[in-house]
Every structure is written in C-alpha cells, then in structure tokens.
Amino acid sequence: MNILLLDQYSDLGGAQQCLLDLLPALRERGWRVRAAVPGSGPLVPAMRAMGVVVDSISCGPYLLGRKSASDALRFAAGFPRFAAGIARLADGSNADLIYVNGPRLLPAAAWAARRTGRPILFHCHSRLAQRYASWLAGCSLELAGAATVACCRFAAEPLARYAGSRLRIIYNAAREPPQKRSPRGPSALLRIGVVGRIAPEKGQAEFLRAARLLAPSLPPCRFVICGDALFSDPGAERYRKLLYELAAGLPVDFLGWRTEVWPVLSQLDLLVTPSIREPAATRVILEAYACRVPVVAFPSGGIPEVVVDGKTGFLVSPSTPAALAAKIASVLARRTKLESAALAGHVLWRERFTLERYRSEMVDAVSWAARRG
C-alpha cells in the first residue's frame, strides 16, 4: 500500500511525535509512505531518517490559536491551490490512502480525495473548539466519507455527528523508558515540574503562582519548567516574559525544549499538568506513568479519561493556583499514597498505553480506512 501523509506543521509537537511513533510500524508492514509538510522543522529530518520521502507543501500563513475572519478569507482564496497540490501529490505517489495528521489540510485533502477517488484517514489530535472549525472539518469528513481516528473522547465529540460509524478512539502511547528510574532518596532535593509546550493554555503561569504559595512551606526544592513555544505562536514571547516575572525569587529551572523527555522525568518527584484549556489527553501524563512519576493535574479536556483520580494520579478542582498548591502540599505529605499512585499509573500504562498497543491499533485503523476506498 502507498500512503500519502500530510501534516500542517514541521515542528515536533505531540501530534508529530505520535506520527513518528507510528511510522516504523507502517514501514514494517511493507507500506510505502510519502509525506508532505510545510517548512523545514525537525519533523522533516526525523522522517527522512526513517526512509520517508518528504515533500514541501504550503498550507497558508496561519498562526496557532483561534482563526480570524481574515484567516478564513485567506484560506478560501488559497483553497483551490492547496487542493490541486494535494491531488498532484496523491497522483504522483500513486497513493492508496491519504493520511491527514491535522485539521488545517483536511478540507483540501478531502476535496482531493473525492476528486481522485481515494480513501482518506483523518487523525484528530485535539478538540476543534471553534464552531466554524468543527463544522468545516465535519463537512470535509462527510464530503470524502473519511475514516477518523481521535486521540480521546473529548477530541472526538465535535466530530461524532459527522463521522458516525467511521470514527474510532485510539489513545496515544508512551515508549518504554530507556532505563528504569532510580529511586529518589529521602535526602534528594525535591523536584516538581511541568513538561510541555510553553503556552497560556498549558498552565505554566498557574504552576508558578502555585509555586510561590508553596515555596515557604516546602523543604528545599526546585520547580522545573521544561518546554518551549512551538508552531509560530504569536504570543509566545509575551507569555515567556510573564513566566520569568512570576519566577523571580523562586527556585525555578527553565530547561527549554528537550527532544528526549526521559532524563527530565526521571529527575522529578512529581509531574504537574496544570492545563487550563487542554484540547486532548496530553501524552506527557502517559510518559510519566511509564517512568513511574506521580501526576497532579487539572481535570481539563481529555485528562480525566487517562487519570483515575486518587488512584493513578490526583486531579485538582477548582483549576486555580491556590487549589493546585494545596493539592501538591497534600500529596507530598503522603509519600506512601504518592508511591502507590506512581505504581498504579505504571500498571495502567502497561495495560492501555504502550507503544505496541498504539501501533497495533493504528495499523488496523489504517488498513480499515484503506479498505473503505
């Protein structure tokens, strides 16, 4: 089978990491994969290192976040060119399936699939919160009769009425850590951290406000923020400046972006996921489970689908810095409960969120989507 794979970014966000997780399994089946992405970010050399031919594609000068009326007009003006380009790529690669890894290219890909008679699989990695965006994606799914995979029920909900029986839920996965995490001794400096893209919806500011409330009462500790802005986020520099202001006088380490998350997680006593507008079920929680790191999180988006409160992790309500500080203090005071949650999270990862399970389910979904053609 020949697969044409389309992504709207070439940075390495969660959706792109999922793609890299899947590619070896597709190639092991003997399927030929050709990809097209905009730009020349780290996704491009990563895919080429796996033997994937990568073409460049334009999908418009749109920035991360909510789209404006002018964005919609630019999209409409560029649509014929986008769609024709995808159709040419599909014909040139003799594609048996068009795999769309994000919503921005979905309308053009759906039109190209319909025109060329090819099946299409849309992988939905985050909830389309804007009504216009979910309507446009839904109409595209209907136009092409597309198969859809969503990473959680929360992400799937706006599309369910359009996709119907053509929708599957396949949760993300975490790889096996390269080595077992060494126990953190009682004399080790306490480390509490956030890992992920730097953005207001990810809650680093809430974490730092909670840290300021916590710092006077905790034993010596470090607060860790690992990550950076991605996807040409227009507000990134302003938000980064706010974070440094909030961190002033606190024992905070800003680690920047790390390609490998395991060395960071292995040094944490507690992972905090303070997302205030989480669009899916963040994969860093699954990575923490794999690494036996306990988790405290706001119950945002699809997070409650992967965290069993009080068993595999601890959910915080209301989603405020004060409540977060109180929850962190509470769980740190109960080390036995914390260790129990870390073990239960690891067991849940083994049962539901391994890379092998993800690849198996996704390969089956790709085969299912291709048979629909």
Region locations from a protein language model:
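Conserved acidic donor-binding segment of nucleotide-sugar-dependent glycosyltransferases
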Residues: 309-310, 314-321, 330-336
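Short His-centered aromatic/hydrophobic patch
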Residues: 100-106, 124
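Nucleotide-activated donor-binding/catalytic signature segment of Leloir-type glycosyltransferases, i.e.
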Residues: 237-257
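A short, well-ordered alpha-helix in the C-terminal region of glycosyltransferases
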Residues: 323, 330, 337-352, 358
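Acidic donor-binding loop of glycosyltransferase active sites
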Residues: 266-280, 293-294
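Short hydrophobic beta-strand element within catalytic cores of glycosyltransferases
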Residues: 294-297, 307
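A conserved mid-protein helix/loop that constitutes part of the nucleotide-sugar donor-binding site
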Residues: 13-21, 199-213, 286, 322
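Carbohydrate-associated surface elements
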Residues: 154, 173
